[in-house]
C-alpha cells in the first residue's frame, strides 16, 4: 500500500512539473527566434511573426508592417559571410497579459566567427509581444535596439568651507 501511495505522489508531483502554461509556451516560442536567427534562413525567422506584426529591427528606420517587409529586413540582416553564429537571450522579464498574450522584455546578443575570431554584437534590448493564434504562438510586436552605454559617473562638487 505504501509503495502505491508513493508512486501516486511521485506521479502527481511529476505532472505538475511537466505542465506548462501560456507564459512558458510563449517563452518557448520566443526562444525559437534565437535558434533560427543562427541558421541564416530569413523565411523561417519571418514565419515566427504574425502577418500583421509590428516590427522594429535594430536597423529599421520605420515600423515594418508586412510579412514581405520582415523577410526583406532579415534578408539584409542575415546576409554575408557569417561563419559560426550563436545568439542567446538573457535578463528576460515576462508579463502574462492573458491566456493568449504575453509580453517579454530583455536583452540578447549574438556572436559570430569573423576572420577566425569570435565577434560579439550587442547586447541589444528587445521587447516582444507574443500572441497565441490557433495552436501557435506568434510575434505580434517586436522592437530591438542597441543597449545604451552607461553614462560616466560624474563626481558631485563638494562645497569648500
Tell where the protein language model's regions lie, with residue ranges.
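A solvent-exposed, acidic/Ser-Thr-rich amphipathic alpha-helical stretch
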Residues: 24, 42-100, 120-121
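Bacterial N-terminal signal peptides that target proteins for export
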Residues: 1-7
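Beta-strand elements of well-folded, non-transmembrane domains
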Residues: 38, 110-114, 130
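Outer-membrane beta-barrel domain signature
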Residues: 19, 81, 116-117
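Solvent-exposed loop/turn segments at secondary-structure junctions
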Residues: 52-55, 60-62, 109-112, 145-149
Amino acid at each position: 500500500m505504501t509503495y502505491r501511495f508513493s508512486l501516486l505522489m511521485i506521479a502527481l508531483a511529476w505532472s505538475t512539473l511537466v505542465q506548462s502554461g501560456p507564459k512558458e509556451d510563449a517563452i518557448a516560442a520566443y526562444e525559437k527566434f534565437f535558434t533560427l536567427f543562427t541558421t541564416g534562413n530569413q523565411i523561417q525567422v519571418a514565419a515566427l511573426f504574425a502577418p500583421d506584426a509590428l516590427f522594429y529591427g535594430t536597423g529599421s528606420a520605420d515600423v515594418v508592417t508586412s510579412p514581405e517587409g520582415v523577410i526583406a529586413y532579415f534578408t539584409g540582416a542575415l546576409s554575408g559571410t557569417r561563419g559560426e553564429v550563436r545568439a542567446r537571450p538573457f535578463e528576460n522579464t515576462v508579463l502574462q497579459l492573458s491566456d493568449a498574450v504575453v509580453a517579454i522584455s530583455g536583452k540578447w546578443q549574438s556572436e559570430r566567427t569573423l576572420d577566425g575570431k569570435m565577434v560579439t554584437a550587442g547586447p541589444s534590448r528587445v521587447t516582444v509581444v507574443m500572441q497565441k493564434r490557433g495552436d501557435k504562438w506568434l510575434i505580434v510586436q517586436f522592437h530591438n535596439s542597441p543597449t545604451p552605454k552607461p553614462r560616466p559617473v560624474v563626481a558631485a562638487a563638494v562645497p569648500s568651507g
